Amino acid sequence: MHQPPESTAAAAAAADISARKMAHPAMFPRRGSGSGSASALNAAGTGVGSNATSSEDFPPPSLLQPPPPAASSTSGPQPPPPQSLNLLSQAQLQAQPLAPGGTQMKKKSGFQITSVTPAQISASISSNNSIAEDTESYDDLDESHTEDLSSSEILDVSLSRATDLGEPERSSSEETLNNFQEAETPGAVSPNQPHLPQPHLPHLPQQNVVINGNAHPHHLHHHHQIHHGHHLQHGHHHPSHVAVASASITGGPPSSPVSRKLSTTGSSDSITPVAPTSAVSSSGSPASVMTNMRAPSTTGGIGINSVTGTSTVNNVNITAVGSFNPNVTSSMLGNVNISTSNIPSAAGVSVGPGVTSGVNVNILSGMGNGTISSSAAVSSVPNAAAGMTGGSVSSQQQQPTVNTSRFRVVKLDSSSEPFKKGRWTCTEFYEKENAVPATEGVLINKVVETVKQNPIEVTSERESTSGSSVSSSVSTLSHYTESVGSGEMGAPTVVVQQQQQQQQQQQQQPALQGVTLQQMDFGSTGPQSIPAVSIPQSISQSQISQVQLQSQELSYQQKQGLQPVPLQATMSAATGIQPSPVNVVGVTSALGQQPSISSLAQPQLPYSQAAPPVQTPLPGAPPPQQLQYGQQQPMVSTQMAPGHVKSVTQNPASEYVQQQPILQTAMSSGQPSSAGVGAGTTVIPVAQPQGIQLPVQPTAVPAQPAGASVQPVGQAPAAVSAVPTGSQIANIGQQANIPTAVQQPSTQVPPSVIQQGAPPSSQVVPPAQTGIIHQGVQTSAPSLPQQLVIASQSSLLTVPPQPQGVEPVAQGIVSQQLPAVSSLPSASSISVTSQVSSTGPSGMPSAPTNLVPPQNIAQTPATQNGNLVQSVSQPPLIATNTNLPLAQQIPLSSTQFSAQSLAQAIGSQIEDARRAAEPSLVGLPQTISGDSGGMSAVSDGSSSSLAASASLFPLKVLPLTTPLVDGEDESSSGASVVAIDNKIEQAMDLVKSHLMYAVREEVEVLKEQIKELIEKNSQLEQENNLLKTLASPEQLAQFQAQLQTGSPPATTQPQGTTQPPAQPASQGSGPTA
């Protein structure tokens, strides 16, 4: 437990980093879908690597379109820094791998299992396993970002995490981060990608030096640079991409498959086209790193590559984690673990390459953003577009981080300050994360260490979520977030960032705003990673956490000068939050997220508070540096904001689904300054619209794939990311949906892109939806969901006939949470397709309409509702597209809510479980119920909403929707009901175990406190007696007179003394009882 504190710190830091990383990773992933996970890594690592790459890559712009976003997100402006980064990155990478090798492995294994769901594990296992282990560690660090995802596993993870994580993890994490970044850079450079492992290693030393000596600054820079670099890359887009792709995937897009295999890059690869380079490099290096880290450990096999997705995941994780900081390495690992978990689901879901990617993203996020990575990966999987989404996912993952973050928080809490706030309090974790971020910011030490800083970014990205996962930054990212962010988590943010950054570059100032937001995102995710970045927004919780973190981080960073990084971290966090953040996961949304975060805040006050602050900070002080970032990121933010925001938000949302909504809300508000994104914000709305566009944009989607895709994907991921949190994965799964997701991203992108350009717009549009959907989805099945989602998606997609598809989906959902998600996604996809028009439209049209408003409302509402709404909203779009899906989506949404509620984590988990069941039920309504359980009132409302899926604010619409849902449900209800019951039982058990765990921890804390008080009391009594003995009669008489007179000294003291013990006792008994 004690370790946990450190772990926590590490985790938080990791999360932060994770989240940030996530965010970045997300970016990267965005850059390269395939890179998704790698991307995530890239984001952080690549950020470093990428940046350098970016510079190098710039020339090859064409290929790099996606990367540009990453670059953009990173920081278009700083190519030079990137170069520096490069060195750094490489050094880092190398270092990372090294440190990670042993540590990470451990982490992976420990956490992975717990975190990862069996399915996830299997999916991610090949790569995941290594990663998983990492992830687990990461989770631990992150706050059991992943754990959260797997409700049951969470506990284990927590435990394992506490144990596993410990300081070492953190250290390794940090190292990993360093390595990771280093590696990433090389990857980014591209040459290394294939070699990633070796080159990185060799570089390691050099880079390390840089890192150590320069790293710090570099890192800081790094972050900035990365962001900037990314920006550049992004802006250059192509070059970056190419470089990245090349690096990562030597092959480049073509290589993608291979690359994918090769290293995380592989995942990246798939995504590669999107932003493989970045991603790849990221993944590549990161993968390498991961691999190195992990591979060195066991990871090699993971090779992250092994499962492309997984690989990526690993990478991502590493990124988030690695980035996080060397220490974080362990953390990272933890993050990774988380990621893995998430990823696993993603992996599971993604198992397809796409999935894998998804997974990667998640991982990123989870890492805290590892998770995010996974998400991104997932996105990737779906296709390039998916890849992009993947990137987003990454962000998301931050979210998982975020989600994870939530849980993580609990865990973290116990570890670091268990008694401070209920374990269950997400805030706690985030706060921790925040602290961490602060630390991070402060960490500057660490951050300074390149790793740290990057991590921060990563974290932001992550917390995810990651995570953001992570948590704060990565918190879970998720570190936890990531994270989750931030988890939870980052990628999305990153992606968004990338895009946004691109945009940013284009519209830096606006971007600035956006960035700020975004940064917030990242920050959030980072912290989360996940995380705060909400990504990692990984926190995801992490993100959210991250967000919080971010805020703090922001502060810190701002104060420290880390600011920039912090910003990034923040961004990451934000992303993450969106992520990681989360979750992310949540942070990501940062941009939007920021707003989101605010929103987030709403949903997750804790986070959100942090987030908002972050937001403010971003805008305010950070702006300066943050602005830098901000600018860079801003764009991202902006972009993010738009779609991403959503995503980001989602990330955070993912962190908290709410975030998403929030994001959206925020978005809607235009909040983020992002306003540009505003639209983004609108995103939600826009998304909706876009979503609507989706249908229109179906093409967009396809288009997306190419460049757009990346972006969209990125965004989708973001969206996904946002979702991620819990569902990040799901999201990702959806991402698999990705197409849809991508679309969503697109949608999101559009805002950003729109800013950037029409195409993106179109792309963006759809993505937005998807994103949202994803979000919904994400939440719903955090890990599983994703997988399911993916599966589902296919079906859904296949099923296009929404109605049927929907039901199937519903059923599918029953079978798998994912499915629900899937369906959602699928709905998305479908919706994207015709569904939107068709089914949705018919039944849903109104709903959509409602949705939209609801969206806003929901958003406002709350996060939960907002989320719901958002989800729904988007779903609405989707919903529109598909009634059922909508419903499902909503459920997802609900799920999100739940996640958001987090309810907390537990609720979320339970909900997830339920969700799994419920979703199946189409029972969105049920899901909602489940959600409601988790969410409680909101949830319920949501549920209703869900039911009313159509109406996001379903509450109002409920009647309408419900019927819809109900009707649809009925067909699948028989089995669904049973499945749901089972799920509910499982969820209850899970909750029970979690509660027991939490209670035990609290009791322990209280016992210790009581002990301390008793000791103190006895000591005071002894002192009193001694004083009495020593005192002269005159003095005593005086004293007595004073007492009688009412002099407080003695009297008060004794009373005070007595009271404390009494209180403790009562406390003890209370808790004990």
Curated annotation (Swiss-Prot):
Under Gene Ontology molecular function, one entry of this record is: identical protein binding
What broad class describes the main subcellular location of this protein?
Answer: cytoplasm
Which portions of the chain have biased composition (kind: Pro residues)? 58-70, 614-625
State the compartments where it is located. Answer: Cytoplasm; Nucleus; Cell membrane
Q: Where is the composition biased (Acidic residues)?
A: 133-142
How this chain sits in the membrane, per its record, is: Peripheral membrane protein
**Polar residues bias: where?**
257-271, 742-764
Per UniProt, what is the name of the gene that codes for the protein in this document?
TSC22D1
Induction remark: Induced by cytokines including TGFB1 in aortic endothelial cells.
| InterPro entries, A to Z | TSC22/Bun, TSC22/BUN_CS
Renumbered residue ranges of the record's region Leucine-zipper: 1006-1027
Q: What job does the chain carry out? A: Transcriptional repressor. Acts on the C-type natriuretic peptide (CNP) promoter. Acts to promote CASP3-mediated apoptosis. Positively regulates TGF-beta signaling by interacting with SMAD7 which inhibits binding of SMAD7 to TGFBR1, preventing recruitment of SMURF ubiquitin ligases to TGFBR1 and inhibiting SMURF-mediated ubiquitination and degradation of TGFBR1. Contributes to enhancement of TGF-beta signaling by binding to and modulating the transcription activator activity of SMAD4.
What is annotated about its quaternary structure and interactions?
Answer: Forms homodimers. Forms heterodimers. Component of a complex composed of TSC22D1 (via N-terminus), TGFBR1 and TGFBR2; the interaction between TSC22D1 and TGFBR1 is inhibited by SMAD7 and promoted by TGFB1. Interacts with SMAD7; the interaction requires TGF-beta and the interaction is inhibited by TGFBR1. Interacts with TPT1/fortilin; interaction results in the destabilization of TSC22D1 protein and prevents TSC22D1-mediated apoptosis. Interacts with SMAD4 (via N-terminus). Interacts with ACVRL1/ALK1, ACVR1/ALK2, BMPR1A/ALK3, ACVR1B/ALK4, BMPR1B/ALK6, ACVR2A/ACTRII, and BMPR2.
Instruction: State the name under which the record lists this protein.
Output: TSC22 domain family protein 1
Q: Where is this region: Required for interaction with TGFBR1 and promotion of TGF-beta signaling?
A: 1-98
Q: What's this protein's family per the entry?
A: Belongs to the TSC-22/Dip/Bun family.
